[in-house]
């Protein structure tokens, strides 16, 4: 197999195919994401959005195709024309360059907020004192510097998601993936999380956000992608996709959510 890597891109997805049993989820998706941009992925539930996002940092293993981040194959290596799985330690190293913010926070309930942020860096060799200093700085950046000794159960959903974002920033990742970061929140808490994500735009990081927040997509997105039934139906600028969609499937979806 010949693999061509584009150094000008932050993320490349080539012919991504994934099925669960006999149900196709991704049907040969190709995508290139420019460095420092915000790409927003929208689409109906079950369309493959989250699966595609999870494939970028190899939380989902593709049946066919491959992913490249920063010029490096993710989760696999090319060997004598074949794709082979990397060792777990090498996959974990790669994931440290790719932040991931989950829909349901995924904080450790038995650890304090500070420990939730320091746990991974310390396990990968960062000195505890340095990890704590960084964690405190990150908590301050998301407005939670007074919560370092609290436990997740003592925080609101919005606060927990802000901690999750701080944790994703702990390795200073090149790319940050957000999997519907506001969908588990009460409506009044959505704004505080979107404000933190908004603050990350223009920092040089590449953000890829799966969301149902169409207004947010219009405001911060450089590129909007509409996915349905495992394929990219339409993509372009927010104005093109959200305000002047060409494909009937895009038009139908937006008519139901706007």
Description of each model-found segment:
Residues 176-179:
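Catalytic Walker B motif of ABC-type/P-loop ATPase nucleotide-binding domains
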Residues 150-153, 171, 203:
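Conserved signature/switch motifs of ABC ATPase nucleotide-binding domains
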Residues 235-236:
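ABC ATPase "signature
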Residues 111-119:
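Short coil-to-helix segment of the ABC ATPase nucleotide-binding domain corresponding to the Q-loop/switch region
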Residues 211-212:
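H-loop/switch region of ABC-family ATPase nucleotide-binding domains
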Residues 187-189:
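Helix N-cap at the start of a conserved alpha-helix in ABC-type nucleotide-binding domains
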């Amino acid at each position: 197999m010949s693999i061509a890597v584009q150094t000008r891109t932050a993320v490349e997805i080539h012919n991504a195919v994934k099925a669960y049993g006999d149900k196709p989820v991704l049907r040969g998706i190709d995508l290139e994401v420019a460095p420092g941009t915000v790409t927003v992925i929208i689409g109906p539930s079950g369309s493959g959005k989250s699966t595609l996002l999870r494939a970028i940092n190899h939380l989902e293993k593709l049946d066919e195709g491959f992913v490249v981040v920063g010029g490096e194959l993710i989760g696999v290596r090319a060997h004598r024309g074949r794709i082979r799985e990397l060792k777990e330690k090498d996959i974990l190293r790669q994931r440290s360059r790719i932040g991931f913010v989950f829909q349901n926070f995924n904080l450790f309930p038995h650890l304090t907020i500070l420990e939730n942020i320091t746990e991974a860096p310390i396990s990968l060799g960062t000195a505890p004192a340095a990890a704590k200093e960084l964690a405190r700085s990150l908590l301050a950046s998301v407005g939670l510097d007074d919560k370092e000794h609290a436990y997740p159960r003592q925080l609101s959903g919005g606060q927990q998601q802000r901690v999750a974002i701080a944790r994703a920033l702990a390795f200073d990742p090149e790319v940050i993936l957000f999997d519907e970061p506001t969908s588990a929140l009460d409506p009044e808490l959505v704004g505080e999380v979107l404000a933190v994500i908004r603050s990350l735009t223009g920092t040089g990081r590449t953000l890829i956000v799966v969301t149902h927040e169409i207004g947010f997509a219009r405001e911060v997105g450089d590129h909007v992608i509409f996915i349905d039934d495992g394929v990219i139906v339409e993509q372009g600028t927010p104005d093109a996709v959200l305000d002047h969609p060409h494909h009937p499937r895009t038009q139908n979806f937006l008519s139901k959510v706007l």
